[in-house]
Amino acid sequence: MNPLPVSLHARFRCFGAKHPAMRRARAWLLAMALALHGYPAHAQDQPRVVDVPTRPGVTQRFLFIAPDAPKAAAILYAGGHGGLQLDPSGRFGWGAGNFLVRSRQLFVNDGIAVAVIDAPSDRQSAPYLNGFRLSKEHADDARAVIAWLREQLHVPVWLVGTSRGTQSAAAVAIALAGGGGPDGIVLTSTILREDRGGTAVTDMNLASLRIPVLVVHHQNDGCKHCPVSETDTLLKKLEASPKAERMIVSGGTSRGDPCEAFAYHGFNGLESGVVDAISAWMLAR
């Protein structure tokens, strides 16, 4: 079994760092991630592009990949403007290097089906998802994809966002808290400060979330919108969640713009370990 190529520190809201239960939970999480990392890839269906009707005259496109017997499904929200420009053959016009987009197969290898979500059909030009992520229409589009996955797979459905994709994951979960929403969300490299007129995740109505939430952050994330110190505030605002936990990761390499996909912000060099740990956490819920 290969060693996990990342230093993972799971921080739990209910316990202090030296509490025995904290140590047991951390050891269990690492064991689960190591087990997933050592397993062979699951048999899977061929990736396919799916267009689901959502609002009148609008469809939501995503790349769907499922292992032979999925245990859960994850809708993956990329950061940036979110317009992946996915063509019918499954090629990305933009965003192929995004952390979640480039790591999609790792989730499938762990037994999790993925829907790599594009902008909807009425947002296929600039600004794509910019200025749209907190809208009712965005939540309606997500509701349709969640329903499709549940109907096809009969498994729990999660939203996983990275960077600006965390604004989508959190906003959709809040909007659909009354019904039709996800079974849980994962926020990686969360937007914790905003200077473009948008909304930081910590300024959303997180108290309405009654689902599990995992926060994953690199301890050296240099993006000005994502200071690791403010994950404390994020966890405090998730008090209503039945299970709100935080993973702080270290290691890897960083190159380019600190807010881009191959900086620490995008878990460069840590993809396999981080995804395995996320998968283990999701599948344990």
List each language-model region with its residue ranges.
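C-terminal catalytic histidine-bearing segment of alpha/beta-hydrolase fold enzymes
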Residues: 242-285
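Short, surface-exposed "cap/lid" segments of acyl-processing enzymes
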Residues: 67-106
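Primarily recognizes the serine-hydrolase "nucleophile elbow" in alpha/beta-hydrolase
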Residues: 147-148, 152-208
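Conserved alpha/beta-hydrolase
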Residues: 104-124
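N-terminal cap/lid segment of alpha/beta-hydrolase-fold proteins
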Residues: 44-69
